[in-house]
């Protein structure tokens, strides 16, 4: 609802009485807007009375032209400075502009932004004199009363804001320097404008018809002519310009080659876009929690990203471990190659000795026989060695897989323990027990048995406590569900009551609107009757002078009767309006009280439900119990 400007109550209709004292840039219209219940009556205006106040000053209603072209624009009212002088960023920007201008134009001293944070009065006078010499080259600082001279110069240049004398004594003060530096920046803008005006470029050359200016706006001489003609008529006392508007529309259509056949296509496109907007709004209404669901999806994806990052970290650590193993195997391989080379050299040496010796045939046969036996023995041993190596490699693979599986299970156990707040010992549900397993898998297997015996007893104790908590939470949940069901039933009943009250309020609103329309029709009818009577009076004055007195008496009588009827109608409408307003206010207050009560109930139920959901650990405890049982089975299984 909108609040009326006449009374402090909430109006049921849009605001009809506008602020008559606020000046606007639009052309004033001839009709006076009046509030509801006030029948418009034409009041006779004297030839010298003031009718309206325009943006440019007072305008007489007798049709005579104004003596002044522009009027009292703004008067002597003090203009409020719209610049953010209390904003540090704005002041620093002004200081930078001042520093850049002085340094670029050859100021006698090299200035920095820091040195201009709070200059002295002497430095300010030098800076002002340097800038002002661009406008007045013969200017010199006054020897005395500079506090009066400088504000006077700014005023003569047209600076719209006043500079006090006291500010000239404390130029560098924190409360004064922002106003001074803003004035200096304005003076710099004046200097730049003067430099542009002194140049030979035709800056203010009038653009041609249809030409585009620098800021992208099309210049239109037709609109300028239309504005001049309308303003001339406005200053002569006219308030409507229908003939100029029609002529302007025709000229614009001819100038821009408007094809009226395309209007229907544009209207269809507009309707299509409106339907698209309605469809999107319906989709938005059908999916009110889409943002919440997307946020939940975002949180879930972030959790998945964190899991993948943890997995990558584990993979990197495992890769580092494999690299260490590869390096150790490479070292063993190099050592074995060195031994093989030494054995080959020894064989070559022995073979050389064998070739140089002289043996008998029996010795050669015996040596060949022994050589064959040794070769068979070597082949058998080599085969056994290969089998042992293959078996050792398979055992190492099994051990590595088993170790990796155990490490994965340990990391998963630690992750679940942190998730359910059992790790570290200071966690919420740890009860001082240390459930973290820190064992060396390369050592004896008795450490796993030790940790299994260490963890089983506290876990059994925590499981027994959890079962009791689950039973209590289940009972509490059932009670809360019953309460929520009762509250939902109550809310449904209250919603039905609110719907009935809203229907009644809608009917009253329709009745009220009907009464308003009837009153407006009566008002229009009375206005037409008054206009016809006025025309009849004018005809009687021009045609028949003898019956003037009788016509005036009849007119006065008719006006009295009309005023009486208007007064009676106004009183009746006021009474009807008051009754309707009281009824609608009562209904609105009742609806507001019911909505407030329902909102309080809803908030209370939501708070209780949120508190219950925070305490609802049934699902988490069941998952925890299943995981504990699974881990217990793993720990109870015999180690490899």
From Swiss-Prot:
Comp. bias intervals (Polar residues): 1-11, 61-70
UniProt entry keywords in alphabetical sequence: Cell cycle, Cell division, Centromere, Chromosome, Coiled coil, Kinetochore, Mitosis, Nucleus
Gene3D superfamilies assigned: 6.10.250.1950, Ncd80 complex, Ncd80 subunit (1.10.418.30)
Record bears the keyword RNA-binding: no
GO cellular component: kinetochore; Ndc80 complex; nucleus
GO terms (BP aspect): attachment of mitotic spindle microtubules to kinetochore; cell division; chromosome segregation; metaphase chromosome alignment; mitotic spindle organization; positive regulation of mitotic cell cycle spindle assembly checkpoint
Lineage: superkingdom: Eukaryota
Bilayer-crossing regions: none
Compartment annotation: Nucleus; Chromosome, Centromere, Kinetochore
Chief location bin: nucleus
Stored InterPro entries: DUF5595 (IPR040967), Kinetochore_Ndc80 (IPR005550), Ndc80_CH (IPR055260), Ndc80_sf (IPR038273)
Pfam family for this entry, one: Ndc80_HEC
Coiled-coil segments: 249-394, 467-636
Single GO MF annotation: kinetochore adaptor activity
Residue ranges, annotated region (Disordered): 1-79
Assembly information from the UniProt record: Component of the NDC80 complex, which is composed of ndc80, cdca1, spbc24 and spbc25. The NDC80 complex interacts with mis12 and zwint. Interacts with cep57r.
Function: Acts as a component of the essential kinetochore-associated NDC80 complex, which is required for chromosome segregation and spindle checkpoint activity. Required for kinetochore integrity and the organization of stable microtubule binding sites in the outer plate of the kinetochore. The NDC80 complex synergistically enhances the affinity of the SKA1 complex for microtubules and may allow the NDC80 complex to track depolymerizing microtubules. May play a role in chromosome congression and may be essential for the end-on attachment of the kinetochores to spindle microtubules.
Family affiliation: Belongs to the NDC80/HEC1 family.
Name of the protein this chain belongs to: Kinetochore protein NDC80 homolog
Organism of derivation: Xenopus tropicalis (Western clawed frog)
Gene coding for it: ndc80
């Amino acid at each position: 609802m909108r609040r009326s400007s006449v009374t402090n109550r909430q109006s049921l209709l849009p605001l009809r009485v506008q602020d008559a004292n606020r000046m606007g840039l639009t052309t004033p219209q001839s009709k006076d807007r009046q509030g509801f219940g006030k029948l418009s009556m034409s009041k006779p205006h004297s030839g010298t009375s003031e009718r309206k106040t325009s943006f440019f000053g007072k305008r007489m209603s007798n049709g005579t032209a104004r003596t002044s072209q522009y009027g009292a624009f703004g008067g002597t009212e003090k203009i409020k400075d719209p610049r953010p002088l209390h904003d540090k960023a704005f002041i620093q920007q002004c200081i930078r502009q001042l520093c850049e201008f002085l340094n670029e134009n050859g100021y006698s001293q090299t200035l920095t932004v820091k040195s201009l944070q709070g200059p002295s009065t002497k430095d300010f006078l030098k800076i002002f004199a340097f800038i002002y010499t661009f406008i007045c080259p013969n200017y010199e600082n006054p020897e005395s009363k500079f506090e009066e001279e400088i504000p006077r110069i700014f005023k003569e240049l047209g600076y719209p804001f006043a500079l006090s004398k006291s500010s000239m004594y404390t130029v560098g003060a924190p409360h004064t320097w922002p106003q001074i530096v803003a004035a200096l920046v304005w003076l710099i803008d004046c200097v730049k404008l003067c430099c542009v005006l002194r140049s030979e470029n035709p800056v203010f050359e009038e653009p041609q018809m249809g030409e585009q200016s620098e800021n992208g706006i099309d210049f239109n001489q037709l609109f300028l002519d239309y504005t001049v003609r309308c303003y001339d008529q406005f200053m002569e006392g006219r308030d409507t310009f229908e003939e100029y508007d029609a002529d302007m529309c025709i000229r614009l259509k001819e100038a821009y080659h408007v094809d009226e056949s395309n209007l229907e296509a544009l209207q269809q496109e507009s309707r299509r876009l409106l339907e698209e907007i309605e469809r999107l709004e319906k989709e938005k209404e059908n999916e009110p929690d889409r943002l919440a669901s997307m946020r939940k999806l975002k949180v879930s994806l972030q959790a998945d990203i964190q899991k993948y990052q943890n997995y990558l970290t584990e993979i990197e650590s495992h890769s580092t471990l494999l690299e260490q193993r590869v390096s150790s195997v490479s070292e063993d391989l190099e050592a074995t190659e060195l031994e093989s080379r030494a054995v080959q050299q020894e064989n070559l040496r022995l073979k050389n000795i064998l070739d140089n010796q002289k043996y008998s045939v029996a010795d050669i046969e015996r040596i060949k026989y022994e050589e064959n036996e040794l070769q068979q023995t070597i082949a058998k041993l080599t085969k056994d060695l290969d089998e042992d190596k293959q078996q050792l490699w398979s055992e190492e693979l099994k051990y590595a897989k088993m170790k990796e599986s155990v490490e994965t299970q340990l990391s998963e156990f630690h992750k679940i323990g942190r998730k359910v707040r059992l790790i570290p010992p200071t966690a919420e549900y740890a009860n001082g027990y240390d459930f973290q397993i820190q064992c060396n898998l390369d050592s004896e297997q008795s450490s796993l048995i030790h940790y299994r015996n260490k963890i089983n007893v506290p876990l059994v104790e925590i499981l027994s406590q959890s079962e009791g908590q689950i039973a209590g939470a289940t009972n509490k949940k059932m009670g809360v569900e019953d309460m929520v069901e009762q509250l939902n039933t109550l809310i449904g009943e209250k919603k039905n009551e609110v719907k009935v009250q809203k229907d009644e309020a809608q009917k009253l609103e329709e009745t009220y609107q009907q009464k308003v329309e009837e009153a407006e029709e009566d008002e229009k009818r009375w206005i037409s009757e008054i206009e016809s009577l006025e025309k009849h009076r004018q005809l009687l004055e021009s045609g028949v002078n003898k019956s003037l007195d009788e016509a005036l008496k009849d007119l006065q009588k008719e006006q009295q009767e009309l005023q009486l009827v208007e007064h009676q109608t106004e009183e009746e409408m006021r009474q009807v309006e008051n009754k309707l307003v009281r009824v609608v206010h009562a209904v609105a207050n009742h609806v507001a009280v019911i909505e407030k009560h329902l909102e309080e109930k809803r908030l209370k139920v939501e708070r209780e439900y949120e508190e219950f959901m925070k305490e609802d650990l049934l699902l988490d405890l069941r998952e925890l119990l299943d995981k504990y049982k699974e881990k217990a089975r793993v720990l109870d299984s015999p180690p490899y």
